[in-house]
């Protein structure tokens, strides 16, 4: 077994690379195969006959058990075995065809390959070497029959044609089915390969499927390939290979094949069978390394190419390893040349780099074979890695998915997986049986057992589906299919011009049914058998009623034989008459003109076709034969026309098509606009979606329409998130009155066709609300559905600017009534919008409906509405480019240069919208004068907002937010300046929408000005004849800009613009104006479609030439005029301010005084110091509530104001303030508290200021360091007495340690200050040792209740632990009560004895009156801690955890994974206590019971000092117990024992002579021996300590880190 595993593992590493299985996986697979009886011995794995049974068995196991590990391992092993056999066969074939000996080997296969002796010996684990005699015998040529030769030279004898050598000129490839070796006998002869072909002889490359000479010198035209692929996308970096005539010729690769391969890779992917077939075809013959790399660069992207290069290198290394072992390997030239290497195989050797001629001349045929085969194998690996196949086990047939589509997905996934080929068919068939729909599964179960392939199963299912019951839609599709012969006959007749007298087209013959003649001209005319027979229909002679021409109303011309009456030639089917009557007496076949209204360039805009008027068709379908090839089409939402037997694919016109019917007199019916379907049908059909629009009247409609109106073509499918599982929210109950109203509204919507009955698995609630008029409104709560949708992006970036309408043009406003209800939902999305109409008391089944149109409240409804209406109006925009049509949601505004043009355009727009299914409210059509649109009133020259109230009601933050939103909407029209918006912005600060707000005086004054402004200000409509001007200015609290005309003379504003709120701490005015100019230019182009003609800048820019860099960047590309003038009068309302470009701050020293500043967060002071002669002057400011940055800024501001008219140097160690002050070199807008402080100081100065930054606490000597140190010392100096410490604590409530450092007082004084604070000491201070552990058993217990759900119904466990011995007692209770606590303690006393004290939390069960009385009767002291806090209860809390873990382990061991049966709970609880108390825990050598009943006698330990509250170390103590984090110490004088934290204990080295000797020391403090300096007995104590460590008591296991 081990030898076989070793051989297989080596083969897998060779042929599988990094993904090879481990030896452990191979061994597990072999063990499984032997266990299942699939292998008699491991060596049977080498037999090809056993591969298929193993594959089938492992595949079935993976399907049944879901365990595919062995199958994956077997797939890799099988691949390695097959590759090894193929390599052996290839080697034998290569040797044979190259004339180097070896027998002719048949293609590899289980039946024809016999294991050689070497392999059989390897099966037995023997190491086998090949002798020289064996190799010679194997290499010797074998006598064979004369093969059929082709016209190329022979490898063995060199004969041109017809040689009798046992070789063929087109040798077989190493893999079955592909030709591999070309005729390259002369290539590389000068390297000593023994050929006779001269250097210049041309040897053609053997192409796939043929052999012969190449037509002269040629090359692979990579440049042409690159040009053809330029439009397809893949990056092409290959360069052409140029082969000169003096070198050996190399037949080029066909560029078309490479182009087609690259396109296949891009569209089908790397793993596609089509891709692999094309790659194998291109590489069926040897290629140069240059061609191989160029080919891979073309078809692979950068990342796959990098993977391929690595994989190719690995494959070539394998070839080199094989060639190294075998000197006569084909790559070594059969031993007649130097051995190959990696540089030669990659074309990197001398004379080969970038030289295709050198590669063709120097590479041996065997090397070319290895290069190409390795490249192909590397491509297969890259295809598997770059495009991993999807998991086939997760594929199931969808509810609406056809079986063929399901089979396509499944087969593609299985064939792209790593399953062995022999396992794929069984897997596919099993998936058919388990993953298809239930009805398909029943069909497959009933299938005969002889169906064993996927193809047979698919054919069987499709055949059975054909006899399924027919539906209405199926019958309609069958009729449509059956009518095609008649339609084609008539269409051909019309096209061929076969007309009778008077130009009328002839019908069908009464006798034979053929077109082109009547019965009278029929050559097959029969004489009437009974000329005297009378017709009962027309009372005529010579025919009966069945033969009467008047029967069908076809002007005496009956349908032919086999054709029923009407337009449906369906034999043995009910006759279906046309469901229409045509007032103009037209025939069903009409002449139609189609006009393309799109903007795409086409050869012809209009075409004439013949179409059938068909009321049985839901939609209009244009035959692909009639559809112009250059008219664009797109994929439809429903890509098929469904009917019996499935459907036919269809597409939809991308452009709107105008359809017009030509009457007999040549006139044109009213044309109709629609998006027709385009399909491969035998004749065009005008369906019900356009018959009414063409003036036809429909009667007796057959069947039920499956589409709504033309608008269905405009339905936009919704996008759902990946996890859009159905949502079901129950309908909440409604009162009877609202339920009646809901029922009425639902019935109304059902009659209008807005909803339809539903059986959807989605449901969301509906409700009604009463409107002001008293009627009810239906609302649908779609929040849960919206959460599953992917919102559409915004398609309209804001509302249109109405002032851009040309001045003086007449206007018309249209309103679309119920716009959402006029646009249908895509059919596949309707079920998600289902709801339930409940009944009272569930007395009847609830009725369920779903929306067919856009529901209100759906997140995508507004966007879809805008898209659909815009798509309907797009042809009109193209048809009337001069018409101004503003569309926002369901509101339309039309503007034309004349009243007549406006009326004509309005009628056309209304007609187009109505034909598309929309409704226009006639009473809402507005015409001048005084139209209103989007909240504005429009006149012939102005645009003014409407709807401002006298004074809004403000109560909350949300009210202020709504008001500010309304003002933001009005600002561009009214020009509300920033100073009037400031009071409202101030009220927006806050985070709670319900936070109270008041209508203060500032808001009232600002609102009064805004209302006054709305009565006088308005926008002027744009006059295209006048230049467009723009202006900007600085004003209070911001900047303002305007677009208009005549701004400097007679201002006519068209649009106001404002600077944005600052986002930085400080923004210079120059930057604000730069951003506003950029915004103004962009708004002009976006609104008016043109650049500003004249730009007015503030006068300061005229004085400062050239213009600043920021202004120049804002004016980049500006071609208009720039004027600098005083502020225009139009800005008076904004109170404009002068812009100063003067620089106020510099970073270079200036002549003048120097001040140093600093601030401290500990003292909350900011100071300024400066030198006056020999001494330093100091000025300081203190603010306990300010941050250190604000203190630094205030200190610098204080320094700036010391000498406001004198240049001043300010030195600071704050980088923050220094950088900010430098940015404030020019005037600007501050936005933070620090920036406001500095800006206020700079605005009061008239002289230059320099800010200099130095590093604090630097040791560099000099004036700056000295001044900074003085400022720092003054900022941090404080002399707080005890009273000031109390004041500091009262203000900040800091702790004693911080108070001690801040006020330079002792810790004891600081603690006393904190303890006197009533807010910081709601509980008394805890002394050290308040939570001691017992020094011996029965001194202190800890008790707690813990919940264990596994012990339900009595799931409360009372736990008591002895703090000295760690012994645990547990009892079980149903509730936490005082009685339960008392019962538990009585049990614990019976087990362990009566304790002196018990500590618990302060729960009611422990602090009740009855519990206190019970403890008093037993004489037990009781203390409490903090409930829910481990402080004081750490040991029992850890005991709870330890107990629960033990219960869980014991329960799972008995098979109780969740709840423990009641009958087993008592026994299991006893087992847990036994395990915890009677066995050692951790490193302890004694059990808790042993420590409890045989305690260790404690003796005094070494002397120590303890730290008392004053911070001093007190002597006179000895250690009794050293625990985890705490120690018990005993006073030598008073015998007082206390517990103190271990950090407050240290050895008392002054008392070493009084130390208790080691034989008297307690083992409980052995852990501290490493820091007790016993000099005289150091070694002895250490030895004792080592021995004592093994006897440390067990309480350390439960010791608490109690503070």
Swiss-Prot record:
Residue numbers marked as site, Involved in capsid protein dimerization upon acidification: 418, 430
Integrase-type zinc finger locations on the chain: 1280-1321
Region (Involved in homooctamerization): 1548-1567
Segments forming CCHC-type zinc fingers: 507-524, 533-550
UniProt xrefs under SUPFAM superfamilies: Acid proteases, DNA-binding domain of retroviral integrase, DNA/RNA polymerases, N-terminal Zn binding domain of HIV integrase, Retroviral matrix proteins, Retrovirus capsid dimerization domain-like, Retrovirus capsid protein, N-terminal core domain, Retrovirus zinc finger-like domains
Gene Ontology BP, a term: symbiont entry into host cell
GO MF terms, alphabetically ordered: aspartic-type endopeptidase activity; DNA binding; DNA-directed DNA polymerase activity; RNA stem-loop binding; RNA-directed DNA polymerase activity; RNA-DNA hybrid ribonuclease activity; zinc ion binding
Binding site for Zn(2+): 1289, 1293, 1317, 1320
Active site: 614 (for protease activity)
Membrane-spanning intervals of the chain: none
Description of its domains: Capsid protein p27: Proton-driven dimerization of the C-terminus facilitates capsid assembly.
Record's function text: Capsid protein p27: Self-associates to form the irregular polyhedron core composed of hexamers and pentamers, that encapsulates the genomic RNA-nucleocapsid complex. Assembles as a tube in vitro. Binds to inositol hexakisphosphate (IP6), which allows the assembly of the polyhedral capsid. Spacer peptide: Plays a role in the oligomerization of the Gag polyprotein and in the stabilization of the immature particle. Essential layering element during tube assembly.
Protein name: Gag-Pol polyprotein
